[in-house]
Amino acid sequence: MCLRRRYQWYYLFGFVHPASGRTEWLLTTTVSGAGMSAALKDFAARVGAGTTRRMVLVLDGAGWHRSKSLVVPEGIHLVFQPPYSPALQPAENLWPLVHEVVANRDFRALDELKDVVSERCTELSSNPAVVKRRTLYHWWPRDHHPKVE
């Protein structure tokens, strides 16, 4: 019997607006300052962040979140939660929702895993009520300034 081990990875960036349940997702092959910069740029473009629309993102202290090479787009402001406090991060409650479709499954190819995760992210994006129930803590700020179009 020949055993061939190899490892390939996909990483999932998840962004959530707890008050609305809106999510944005980005699957990537790397987590690094450059990867996070690309994720922030993609996110800013999707939500229209810029000079007239500002977003606050709450992040943990992961190395790629604080990388010296990180490029933060205009309109995005990063706020870092205290160390070892995942309970303060609403996005942490997204991961069990994603994991439930991949747990205890054998994927023959990385693309198969990517397809399953992408489909799950699409399902979650189309079910903001489910996301909101999991991420909108009673103490989390609500929107006090409705979007003006």
Task: Provide a role label for each language-model segment.
Residues M1-R5, E74-N93:
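RNase H-like polynucleotidyl transferase catalytic core
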